[in-house]
């Protein structure tokens, strides 16, 4: 037969699926009482990540950082208006990361944005932007210090993104007891 319909979503379904995966990870791995989040990035994925996160955590405080402060400010104004949340644009990543319960990175950064000094007990980080070999949002040294690293697919993260860079830097071993999200969800 003939084609009845064609869905041209321009990546929207992929973006929503990515945000849903972030929320599933946060539900499984972050503290249930998490109320504050740092969005590192101020694009479509950041907005979708927050929308999905709010379905699984009682978020009421949001900090936003973007390389372009004007973009973080405009994003924050729109987000506060549309959500009713307390949203603060931040000039630095340090300011955004101060005392938040969850951080979500969703940038195309080639250089680490989150470093060891941002880590503290109870912080959950959902890193979404490192989907290519050259991308890296979290420093290898920070990754070496986390209590738990969970990937959607270890076979992919060993060649792309943060784990790839930490392995290449020699700060974590290939058999460091990393888990996949599916294993965590299955109670393994």
Specify the residue positions occupied by each region the protein language model found.
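Adenosine-phosphate binding glycine-rich loop
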Residues: 136-188
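Short helix-loop-beta connector
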Residues: 29-36, 58, 120-121
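Short glycine-/small-residue-rich Rossmann-like dinucleotide-binding loops
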Residues: 107-109, 129-130, 154
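N-terminal Rossmann-fold NAD(P) dinucleotide-binding loop
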Residues: 46-47
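Glycine-rich Rossmann-fold phosphate-binding loop(s) that bind the pyrophosphate
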Residues: 41-43
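Rossmann-fold NAD(P) dinucleotide-binding segment
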Residues: 95, 99-102, 109-124
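NAD(P)-binding Rossmann-fold cofactor-contacting core
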Residues: 55-82
